[in-house]
């Protein structure tokens, strides 16, 4: 969308530019006018939007970005919500930090560490979606979980994705993992422990958790046996110091954390049994082993049983990325497997864009276990039935090249790509990503396939010790890219994406497109109000920033989880199971029904988060918040979730 912002109407044909006499979409809009907030005073109507928070909660001297500040984070999603539910999407690994050095956005006293979100007003304050015209319609690895074990024999399958495995598992503030989107453990109770001796050191990036199993990209599926083994390994971690995987030759085998579990005991008193007690202790050892094996098998079987729909392995299944290509060749549009994937009548091209991260693209782990081109091709084949535009978050591990190759092999002449560059405090990482961006552009003859380059995602929380410093760093990188593009006659837009309320006049000036991440689920809004709330928030916080300019506005992330609990604007602290934003298939269906087709009719440009579940994110789930791995339209095997219905919008498709 460019030029004057357009109103979002819930009546068909009521699409028109907003004029000064037009009333706000919802009565709650007037709430903002009753509060005196900071005015940026920028020309061209670049005024800071008013927050619905009262001034009594503002923190002076923090540029309205302190704890519970006016406009802190997303007013409604809020900075505090962003800190407790940061929907991260890029290489969010604090590679140059140590265990005691928490970055600002995760520190306990960081700006916005509390939650300033005002609970949603009564239903009358929003237009209920009942009034809307609803349409019918990697590489896995087994991390050392404290005393967790090496994978059991046979569990080191290099072609299957595990619900508990990932090459880019994060550990709280130490390693949030590349391209992740998880809630932060505010209580500091991180689920994993890093063994520094097992960290792969490439000279600049650290804390990428190496794991015992590697999985290639033949499929996203995890066979029940492998899943059971993975679950058993996690539950029966005490066996790690005793059993070694027979598949160790296929990938690195990592034992439990030193000093923990049976391995530590084995090196201690068990290593030198007292005279006359050997047989008795051996008996106890055997008994313990058998008990743990049984418990591990039971728990592992339960985990395997929860995998749901799994992709059926073809006779030509292979174990590694190279093996996949050796057996199946370089998949293309004429491959039988691809033809099947591209012929799903339940998928409809109604999404303007999709957020996407190929599996196995963590640096430096991908240097040892390269991601699979064929797996990316399979993904793009499915994505092509949902959208014509794909967004990436980084350039590491040849992910951009693989997506471009997949588009070429599938002959998707209408498919476009938003390039992504990850920005954080690690200069080596940023420079590597930028150099890869330049290399991709140099090697691509026709730049018309690119819709733009997104420099950083929510970088204001990770590119500096403060938001002001991070913004300065981010803008400097954007300026560098702009200068490079101008020098080399590269004519594509340059943008960044961040939380909706983080945008200000300076950031708008530096970016060709205003890209805002807006998640109604984390605002604690009931699903029947979610579509209306999303539009209201975006309209009042982001569209206004481009008034008087020709800059486009895009919602860079929006979605709804299919399960895992409910959020009342302060995480899973809800009074009951039906309060706030409830995750579920029915709710996901309703949000899509209320939002997708009307946004398509209204010309709203957005990226849906996301196409596929990312099961490894289960490590970030907590007692009351179990949704991190459930944001996909499809399961990891590329199967549409049971009961989910993607609107067909009367046959209208996104362009």
From Swiss-Prot:
Sugar attachment sites: 426, 576, 602
Major enzyme class: hydrolase
Compositional bias (Basic and acidic residues): 89-98, 323-338
Residue spans of biased composition, Polar residues class: 19-33
Listed InterPro entries: Beta-glucan_modifiers (IPR050732), Glycoside_hydrolase_SF (IPR017853)
Topological domain spans for side Extracellular: 304-655
Cell compartment(s), UniProt: Cell membrane
The entry's keywords: Carbohydrate metabolism, Cell membrane, Cell wall biogenesis/degradation, Glycoprotein, Hydrolase, Membrane, Polysaccharide degradation, Signal-anchor, Transmembrane, Transmembrane helix
Positions on the Cytoplasmic side per record topology: 1-282
Entry keyword annotation includes Transmembrane: yes
EC numbers for this chain: 3.2.1.39
Transmembrane segments: 283-303
Location of the active site: 458, 557
Chain intervals for the UniProt region annotation (Disordered): 1-61, 89-114, 305-338
One GO biological process term: polysaccharide catabolic process
Membrane topology: Single-pass type II membrane protein
Reactions the enzyme catalyzes: Hydrolysis of (1->3)-beta-D-glucosidic linkages in (1->3)-beta-D-glucans
Signal peptide from the UniProt entry: none
Any one Gene Ontology cellular component term annotated for this protein: cell surface
Coiled-coil stretches noted in the UniProt entry, renumbered to this chain: none
Function: Glucanases play a role in cell expansion during growth, in cell-cell fusion during mating, and in spore release during sporulation. This enzyme may be involved in beta-glucan degradation. Active on laminarin and lichenan.
Homology family: Belongs to the glycosyl hydrolase 17 family.
Protein name: Probable glucan endo-1,3-beta-glucosidase btgC
Recorded name of the encoding gene: btgC
